Structures are given as C-alpha cells and as structure tokens.
C-alpha cells in the first residue's frame, strides 16, 4: 500500500482492475492528492502483494475484506471509494460491508458485476472461461509459461491496432507497464479471480446506496459497455454520469485532465474535499 497525505482528512481509496497494479492512476495520483489524501493498495497476487496463501480465497469477498483492513490500517478516516474496472465491484461491496465512514464513491469504467457476461456485449467469455480455468488447473506450468511469454510490446501493439485503447489520445508508455505486470500475474489465479468477478453482482445494492456516486464511462469502452454505466446511473439514488466521447477502458489515461477536473468538481460540489 502507498499513501499520501493531502489537504483534506478525507482519503480517496483507490482500487484497481484485475491484473492491474496502479498504472491507471498514473496521473490521477498527483491530481487527486491536491484535493485530498490518497491511498492505493494491491490485490492478492498483484503488485507488491504476495499470492494468496489459500489459492481459493481470490473471490470478491476476500478482496473486499482486504480493502476493509486497509481502511482500518490507515486509521479509518472518512473515505471516498474510487474503483477502476473490477475495482468498481470491490468499491460497491466495500460500501455494503461497512458503509460507515464512506462519504462518496467514484466508479471509473466499471460495472456492478457479471463482467464476463457483458464483455464486448457478449457472454462468450463466460462460456469459454470454465474450460480455460480447467486447463490452467490441470496444466499450471504450461499455461504459466505461455502466459508469461507474450511480449508486452506485442500485446500493446495489438491493443492499439484493434482500438481497445485509443492511439490518438493515449501515450503508449502509460499503458505498457500494465502488459509487463500481466506477464507476472499467476495465470491460474487470474482465471479463478476473473471467474469469481464474472459471477458476482452488486446490482441489488445499487438502490440503497445513500452517498453521492460519480460514474465515469467511455462511449467506446468494449470491456464495460456504456449501457451498463447508464443503468447504474438510473438505479443509484444519488448518481452523476459522465460519458467521455471516444473514451475506452483506459479513459483515465486517455483523458486524464478531464477525468481529474470532473472528480474535483464532484468532490467540491458534495463537500467531500
């Protein structure tokens, strides 16, 4: 975990997507620290965190418990939960677990759940993942070897070529660390974690969330189709939706200045910083 004390006692607690270790917050880290205190942590088996002692403890509930432990470790200050991608599910469930002290939520390019059923507006990933997970379990060394041998620069070029990230607005060097980190994440763990995320849903919680929520979405995000963000905005009692024109799943990097300004406005409007 890393932390920076800012001008406000409120702490913006940042959660990542699966296979991420903070690359998405490269610019927001400094921008947000000018508004409030900030803290960022790593999931089990990600970044500086070791692989889980129990390989089955990799579901949403385990990560939510870890986030709650982080809140207590930093002194249990008032927090605004900030989540990107899978981190939106974690932030929502962290509110369910212990809403006390949560003053607001910021959801970046993420959904309330069942992500493998909506990826690219299809359930293909949900159907393929069980066989992939079975293969990883039966042949862990083989799948780890194949997974780790995909050159990060090649993966980056594919993402740029296919439009999964916008080559006009993103600096490739901002995204390359993600592909380097992915190569070092344990593949069997990744498949189990993704499967758990794909079957989890916090949709039932949305109508009862009684704090301001900012939803930032990209209209070209194929990982989290924008209609899911619109649905969340319509269901949450105190939600604001910002739809970024041309934004993909890494919009916090592509349009980081606009995202920072919009978060600052949200925090100011609601007296959160």
Q: Residue ranges of each PLM-predicted region?
A:
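Catalytic histidine-centered segment of alpha/beta-hydrolase-like enzymes
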Residues: 247-260
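Acidic catalytic loop of the alpha/beta-hydrolase fold
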Residues: 220-224
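Active-site loop/oxyanion-hole signature of alpha/beta-hydrolase fold enzymes
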Residues: 40-86, 98, 261
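Flexible "cap/lid" loop of the alpha/beta hydrolase fold
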Residues: 103-145
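Short beta-strand/loop motif that positions the catalytic acidic residue
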Residues: 209, 215-217
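Conserved alpha/beta-hydrolase catalytic His-Asp/Glu region
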Residues: 116-120, 143-208
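Conserved hydrolase catalytic core segment
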Residues: 77-121
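Conserved HGGG/HGGXW glycine-rich cap/lid loop of the alpha/beta-hydrolase fold
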Residues: 2-51, 70-71
């Amino acid at each position: 975990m890393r932390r920076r004390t800012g001008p406000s006692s409120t702490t913006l607690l940042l959660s990542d997507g699966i296979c991420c270790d903070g690359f998405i917050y490269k610019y927001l880290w400094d921008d947000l620290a000018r508004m409030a205190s900030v803290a960022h942590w790593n999931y089990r088996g990600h970044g500086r965190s070791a692989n889980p002692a129990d390989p089955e403890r990799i579901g949403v509930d385990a990560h939510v418990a870890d986030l709650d432990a982080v809140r207590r470790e930093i002194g249990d200050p008032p927090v605004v939960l900030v989540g990107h991608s899978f981190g939106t599910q974690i932030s929502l469930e962290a509110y369910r677990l212990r809403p006390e002290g949560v003053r607001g939520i910021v959801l970046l390019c993420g959904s309330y759940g069942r992500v493998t059923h909506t990826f690219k507006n299809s359930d293909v990933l949900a159907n393929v993942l069980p066989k992939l997970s079975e293969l990883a379990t039966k042949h862990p060394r083989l799948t780890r070897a194949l997974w780790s041998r995909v050159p990060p620069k090649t993966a980056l070029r594919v993402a740029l070529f296919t439009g999964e990230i916008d080559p006009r607005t993103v600096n490739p060097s901002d995204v390359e660390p993600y592909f380097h980190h992915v190569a070092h994440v344990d593949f069997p763990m990744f498949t189990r974690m993704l499967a758990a995320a794909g079957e989890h849903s916090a949709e039932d919680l949305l109508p009862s969330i009684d704090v301001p929520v900012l939803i930032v979405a990209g209209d070209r995000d194929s990982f989290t189709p924008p209609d899911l963000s619109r649905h969340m905005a319509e269901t949450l009692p105190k939600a604001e939706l910002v739809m970024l024109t041309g934004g993909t799943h890494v919009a916090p990097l592509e349009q980081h200045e606009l995202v920072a300004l919009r978060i600052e406005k949200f925090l100011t409007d609601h007296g959160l910083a």
